[in-house]
């Protein structure tokens, strides 16, 4: 794998998984045991988790029915 691609993926991963308090994405879901806390509306394209304005979702997008 190209080093630049690997670096970019690492940066994106850290951005998505860093809590908002530490400068991560503001809309990142807070998960408990891999599941988000509240029903979601919009899928986070980077992490695969769904997100909502406040607070976040209840389960992964892949587990959504329809």
Curated annotation (Swiss-Prot):
- Keyword terms of this UniProt record: Antibiotic, Antimicrobial, Cleavage on pair of basic residues, Defensin, Disulfide bond, Secreted, Signal
Q: Which GO terms describe its molecular function?
A: CCR6 chemokine receptor binding
In which tissues does this protein get expressed? Answer: Expressed at low levels in kidney, lung, and spleen.
Looking up Gene3D superfamilies in the UniProt record yields: Antimicrobial Peptide, Beta-defensin 2, Chain A
Q: Which Pfam families match?
A: Defensin_beta_2
Q: Which GO terms describe its biological process?
A: calcium-mediated signaling; defense response to Gram-negative bacterium; defense response to Gram-positive bacterium; innate immune response; positive regulation of flagellated sperm motility involved in capacitation
Major site of localization recorded for this protein: secreted
Q: Where in the cell is it found?
A: Secreted
| InterPro entries reported for this sequence | Beta_defensin_dom
* Listed GO CC annotations: extracellular region; sperm midpiece
Extract the signal peptide range.
Answer: 1-23
Propeptide residue interval(s): 61-66
Which cysteines in this chain are paired by disulphide bridges?
29-56, 36-50, 40-57
- Family the entry assigns: Belongs to the beta-defensin family.
Q: What role is this protein assigned?
A: Has bactericidal activity. May act as a ligand for C-C chemokine receptor CCR6. Positively regulates the sperm motility and bactericidal activity in a CCR6-dependent manner. Binds to CCR6 and triggers Ca2+ mobilization in the sperm which is important for its motility.
Instruction: Return the protein name.
Output: Defensin-B1
Q: Which organism is it from?
A: Ornithorhynchus anatinus
